[in-house]
């Protein structure tokens, strides 16, 4: 047990500081913005300090663990802890949220509430990644849904209410399955009901019961990840949300589904996961092809990027279902990699919209001459998204490939077929990304418009773009920086399986 409650402070600090902002006298939008950014920077520094001085990378067990009796009934504890699986996602959450608050500078309407919701979402996400109690995990999972709904409904586009309603129906509906799974695991695991994840990891269940629990959790995480056909909320949500909200959705929210799939389905229910993994592998492969072929048909810029996210999530599903060391490591690396790339693309799409007030690609064109800095950054990050060598996406997808090739679970012919289909998906990716860049930046449409002029990327936007680009290149050149965090934990999870 840790002496100092680092994780409790890290989880509670953003929402507490955000609540304070609501009750203090209104001092203007600029004060609210800088206050929120200072909170995020302080939180990120605190998290980094706590992990640098207290986290041992060669230890696969839970570290910085805390446990406080919360509710006597049902043996409910406030349990926190991190391991190699959660440390990367927590640091990613801090980094992307800090940059998203900086990206939200143009928001002026109800800025106090807007920034409070971003901080509340921050707490919910870090709480989900650091919870070591199943019911606490569920509470944190639900906590971040409310801010996302309000951010969508109040600061979105013309169809924001439709998108927000669709989002909450999908996510709240899937949460019912999550709650049933949580209660089922805790009540039927042993004679003594427990919500402690460490104890539940050592439990065994009747096969039928384990399959039912697995399906319940899978539905909940499939909506968040998302896995087809439960993905339809994502393009609508991204298409209408403010781009700072899109950064949080693409960078962190989707990763919660992948994290839950590894943390609960794979770690707690290994027998059921072994049975379902071939089906997940097929779904992941179809998802790559489906999203990559659907994306070029999207007129809306942000919807096209959203479908690219769905395609990239397919690699995470394949990595998880390979049940191999390289496959799972590649999936974790893809979680971090796409967190940066997805957030960056939505930010640049938003900055372009701020200038031309157009969202449909067939109305754009000829912007490269007027905004060369945004054009350059968008081109580089599009290359990162299509897995250019030297970028983080390339390494992640390559390791997932190795994971499938080395898997002992599948026949050679099925592995060759899966790899062939994945390769087709990787060929389709440059088609929709490069055509998107061509429609936006080349041609003469906007140049020929009378009195056409707008300013290029300012210092704030350039700083944001470069801040996200640096880790993408850094991970691409030296992926072991991320892989070393989770490698021992991955081996620990795979020790429950008979192959890999």
From Swiss-Prot:
Subcellular location: Plastid, Chloroplast thylakoid membrane
Domain of life, source organism: Eukaryota
EC number of this enzyme: 7.1.1.-
Pfam short name (any one): Proton_antipo_M
InterPro entries, alphabetized: NADH_Q_OxRdtase_chain4, NADH_Q_OxRdtase_chainM/4, NADH_UbQ_OxRdtase, ND/Mrp_TM
Regions crossing the membrane: 4-24, 35-55, 87-107, 113-130, 134-154, 167-187, 211-231, 242-262, 272-292, 305-325, 330-350, 386-406, 416-436, 462-482
Record GO cellular component, one term: chloroplast thylakoid membrane
Key words, A-Z: Chloroplast, Membrane, NAD, NADP, Plastid, Plastoquinone, Quinone, Thylakoid, Translocase, Transmembrane, Transmembrane helix
Entry membrane topology: Multi-pass membrane protein
Principal EC category: translocase
Record field: catalytic activity: a plastoquinone + NADH + (n+1) H(+)(in) = a plastoquinol + NAD(+) + n H(+)(out); a plastoquinone + NADPH + (n+1) H(+)(in) = a plastoquinol + NADP(+) + n H(+)(out)
Disulfide bonds: none
GO molecular function, one term: ubiquinone binding
GO biological process entries: ATP synthesis coupled electron transport; electron transport coupled proton transport
HAMAP family: NDH1_NuoM
Homology family: Belongs to the complex I subunit 4 family.
Protein's name in the database: NAD(P)H-quinone oxidoreductase chain 4, chloroplastic
Gene: ndhD
